[in-house]
Regions:
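A Zn2+-metalloprotease active-site environment signal
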Residues: 1-159
Length: 159
């Protein structure tokens, strides 16, 4: 995952479970680098602060904590989750390009997320309730993104 300040961490447990190829690991690292480059963490903190202020004002005006609770739930489904999925899709696209420019096969991002999807099969929730795109959406988007950056990969890899 990516943390504020551009630091990254990769779970060794995940590495041990999916046993990624070098190209797949480059897809993970590229994805996390993209989050740092686009400052997604900073944006999420700012949005959360604005949401909390708005909910506090709403609660104070209405005098009802339940209103703020409902507002928080609606805000999450209508703004926070879709924005998080947008960040994930953007990080996927940029990450694939970064990996390709470094000489790693961008098509490996598709196989990586297929492996990840297999780990969580049966526990997937509807996309609109998730912080991440669905496996089907992600696979389609990554396939298209990989095709676009194949020339960069071929140039970087000398193919």
């Amino acid at each position: 995952w990516c943390m504020p300040g551009g630091k990254m961490a990769v779970y060794t447990g995940l590495i041990n479970q999916i046993k990624p190829t070098d190209d797949e690991l480059a897809a993970v690292i590229g994805h996390e680098m993209a989050h740092a480059l686009r400052e997604h963490s900073r944006e999420q903190v700012s949005q959360q602060m604005a949401t909390n202020i708005g909910l506090s004002v709403l609660s104070a005006v209405t005098g009802a904590g339940a209103t703020a609770d409902l507002g928080g739930a609606l805000s999450k489904v209508m703004f926070t989750l879709p924005n998080s999925r947008t960040h994930e899709a953007e990080a996927d696209r940029i990450g694939v390009e970064l990996a390709a420019r470094a000489g790693y096969d961008p098509r490996a991002a598709v196989t990586l997320w297929q492996k990840m999807g297999a780990l969580s099969s049966g526990s997937a929730q509807p996309e609109f309730l998730s912080t991440h795109p669905s496996a089907a959406s992600r696979s389609a988007d990554l396939t298209a993104a990989a095709a676009k950056v194949m020339p960069l990969y071929q140039q970087a890899a000398g193919k």
